[in-house]
Structure formats: structure tokens, C-alpha cells
A protein has these predicted regions:
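Structural detector for short beta-strands of small beta-barrel domains
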Residues: 53-82
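Loop-to-transmembrane-helix entry motif
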Residues: 14, 188, 192, 313-328, ...
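Hydrophobic alpha-helical transmembrane segments of membrane transport and translocation systems
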Residues: 319, 331-393
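Extended, hydrophilic extramembrane loops/domains of integral membrane proteins
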Residues: 106-143
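Transmembrane alpha-helical segments that form the functional core of multipass membrane systems
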Residues: 150-157, 162-258, 265-278
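Hydrophobic secretory-pathway targeting helix
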Residues: 1-50
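Helical hairpin unit composed of two closely spaced alpha helices linked by a short loop
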Residues: 280-288, 294-340, 347
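Pore-lining and gate-forming transmembrane alpha-helices of multi-pass membrane transport proteins
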Residues: 224-225, 229, 260-277, 323, ...
Length: 393
């Protein structure tokens, strides 16, 4: 057997082991997701607001527009104002296949103009002591959202290939853990901070192992990600203490007070939990990119010392800091555009703005998340310098 054949067999065995590892990892991740999805969270307690038990939201199709008295809005000619009378066939719910007549009022705040053949989401009010009442809630956006997600997935797979598929699996796992573990767990009164930290650690582990098999590069990226997210959370905790911020200062905090009284939801930690979740993706991006770059440098020059590798990581990381810092800060600023315009219309003074809960939360969260990325560069460089041993050639 020639040396070339021997090397080919070794590569095949290595690829087979990696494939088996990914299959087992995906199966374990799927079982974890199904366990979270199937758990009876309501057994821990449930809050239900008053006067909503009779409300149901179902899909309906416009069979006929009986009357349309709408006119273009003077402020935005693309929108219409007025009233429509619609005959709608209910496609779901207790009254499925029933046709109902609905008066659809179009205002500047509720503006859903429907045409024959379109589907919409209908609010179906079925009180015990009165007749059913129907209103148009909104457009049925689910099909378009599915197409958008499908286009995103297709682009990731087309460009990323097999690694793109694994990327989507990791993204789906993280989304499922947030939707079916972190949110219901916090809602039902479980300790929000330990729950979030543990869940995000699992998400980091699964996402990185789906991209790369166990190796020093993977462990370096994982440790760096967890350290960067922890630092972002620690920095925000310091900021929130200095600024006297908690979940009660959030715009939705007041509405969650009643929920907290019945389910044990921990309002105090909600802002910190939000920072941990929002910073995870950016910190993981920097950690894995830098760990991969330093791994390639070590492969190219196996004699590099740990100090040289650390210095190289800092040089590479400075460019990442510039781009990722802009990404995070601009993301938070983009969310604030409409609010800031509204505050300008109200004639707010700068001192009033800086003293507001809104500005304090936005600045503290944006800076804390960005610092998690910035501090992730020396952390990743140091961990890689410690884990990447000189190569023996």
C-alpha cells in the first residue's frame, strides 16, 4: 500500500468520524428541543389577562368587498382612509367555513385595506353571554415571512454549502431554545439569570460544534464567546446599578407587573437577560473568526510563540473591533429612530432626554454589548495563544 493510499484511508476514516459526531450532536440537540417544546410550562402557574379568554385569531379569506368608501390619505397617498364592508370566509377556528360580514375601519393607526381573494387575520370574539363579534386584525403576513426565511436559507446554503446547512441547524437550535426554554422559563418564574446563562452556553456549544468538530479552535471560540458575553453582562450590571435601571424601567415593565405577581417572573433581571441574548451573536462572530484566523497562522508557521500569536490576534482584532462596534451601535440607533423623532416633536431638552429611562437603557445596552465584542479580542487572542501549541514538523 502506498503512502498516498494510506493518507486517503485516514482522511476517509476522519471524515466518517466527523459525520457520525455531527449526526449524534444533531440528534441530541433535537431531543433537547423536543423536550423543551413538550414540557407543560403551565403546570408551574399561568397568568391570563382579563377579557381575553374569549378572543381568538383565525385566518379568513375575503370572498367579496361589499362596499368600499376609502380615499387616499393626504399624509401618505399609498394608504387609504375610510370604511370597507367585507364578506369573509373563516378558514380556521370554531366557526370554520362560515361566512361573516365585517365592517373594516381604516384609520392612520389601524390601516388594513383588503381586496377580494386576500387572506387576513380575523379577531374572533366569542363571549358566553353575547353574539360573536368579528374585526379585521391585520394582514396575513405568515406566507411572505416564510418566503423571506426560505430565501435567506437558500442563500446561506448556496454560498455556504454543507457548512451553511449546519449554520442553519445551529440558528434553528438557538431560536428554539430561546422560544421554548428561556422565554417560558422566565415567564413562569424560574431563576432568569442562571437559566439564560446555562441555555446560552448550550446554544454556543451546539452552534460551534455544528460548524467545526471538537478541536482547539472550537474550544477557544467557545471559551472566548462565553467570556465575552459574561463581560458584556457584567458591564451592563455595573451600568444599570449606576443608572438605577431594572426591568421596571423598560417600556413594557409596567405591563409585566401583574404577570410577575402571579407567575414569579423576575423583573429585576430582564434588561440584563436582554443584553446577554443580544450580544451572543456578535461576540461569537468575533471569537470564531479570530480563532480561525489564528489557527491558520499557526498552521502556516508552526514555530510561532504564544506571545507572537497573541500579538497577531490583537492586530487582526483591531479591524474587527471597528466593524463590529459600528454594527452593534448602529443596530441600537436604528431601533431608536422613530422614538427620537417623536421626542424631537415633543420638544424634549437634552437634559430631559439623558435623564429618561429610554435613553439610559439604549446607551447602557448598546455600549455593554459593544464592549463585550471589544474585550472579546484580547480574550480570544489570549486563549488561542494558550491552547494552540507549536507544531512539530
Amino acid at each position: 500500500m502506498t503512502m498516498q493510499n494510506l493518507l486517503q484511508q485516514c482522511r476517509k476514516k476522519s471524515h466518517s468520524k466527523v459525520l457520525r459526531f455531527w449526526v449524534v450532536l444533531a440528534a441530541v440537540a433535537l431531543l433537547l428541543v423536543l423536550a423543551c417544546r413538550g414540557y407543560d410550562w403551565d403546570a408551574l402557574g399561568r397568568y391570563k389577562g382579563d377579557n381575553i379568554s374569549s378572543l381568538h385569531y383565525v385566518r379568513g379569506r375575503v370572498v367579496e368587498v361589499l362596499r368600499d368608501d376609502t380615499k387616499p390619505d393626504q399624509l401618505d397617498p399609498a394608504r387609504s382612509m375610510g370604511t370597507q364592508e367585507l364578506r369573509i370566509l373563516l378558514l380556521e377556528g370554531a366557526n370554520k367555513d362560515t361566512e361573516v360580514t365585517i365592517a373594516n375601519y381604516l384609520t392612520r393607526t389601524q390601516n388594513v385595506r383588503l381586496r377580494q381573494g386576500e387572506t387576513a387575520i380575523i379577531c374572533e370574539d366569542l363571549p358566553d353571554s353575547a353574539d360573536a363579534y368579528y374585526t379585521v386584525y391585520n394582514y396575513d403576513r405568515a406566507p411572505v415571512l416564510v418566503l423571506i426565511l426560505a430565501a435567506f436559507a437558500a442563500a446561506v446554503v448556496a454560498i455556504g454549502g454543507w457548512k451553511g446547512v449546519r449554520t442553519l441547524l445551529g440558528l434553528g437550535f438557538t431560536g428554539a431554545m430561546i422560544a421554548w426554554l428561556i422565554l417560558p422559563g422566565i415567564y413562569h418564574g424560574l431563576p432568569s439569570l442562571p437559566l439564560t446563562v446555562a441555555a446560552l452556553a448550550v446554544c454556543t456549544l451546539v452552534s460551534l460544534l455544528l460548524l467545526n468538530p471538537p478541536s482547539p479552535k472550537t474550544w477557544a471560540a467557545m471559551l472566548s464567546t462565553l467570556a465575552g458575553v459574561a463581560l458584556a453582562g457584567g458591564v451592563f450590571y455595573l451600568f444599570s446599578t449606576l443608572l438605577h435601571l431594572s426591568g421596571m424601567n423598560d417600556t413594557n415593565g409596567e405591563g409585566l407587573v401583574l404577570v410577575a405577581g402571579q407567575t414569579g417572573l423576575e423583573l429585576h433581571w430582564l434588561l440584563l437577560v436582554a443584553v446577554l441574548i443580544s450580544s451572543l451573536g456578535a461576540v461569537m462572530d468575533v471569537a470564531l473568526s479570530l480563532a480561525s484566523s489564528l489557527h491558520e497562522l499557526r498552521e502556516a508557521d508552526g514555530k510561532m510563540s504564544g506571545l507572537q500569536l497573541f500579538a497577531a490576534g490583537m492586530r487582526i482584532g483591531r479591524d474587527m473591533i471597528g466593524t463590529m462596534s459600528n454594527t452593534l451601535i448602529l443596530a441600537f440607533a436604528g431601533e431608536a429612530v422613530t422614538t427620537l423623532l417623536l421626542l424631537m416633536a415633543y420638544g424634549w431638552h437634552s437634559s430631559q432626554l439623558f435623564a429618561s429611562d429610554y435613553a439610559a437603557i439604549q446607551v447602557a445596552q448598546g455600549v455593554a454589548s459593544t464592549l463585550g465584542v471589544v474585550l472579546g479580542v484580547p480574550i480570544t487572542s489570549g486563549i488561542c495563544a494558550a491552547l494552540y501549541r507549536p507544531l512539530k514538523r
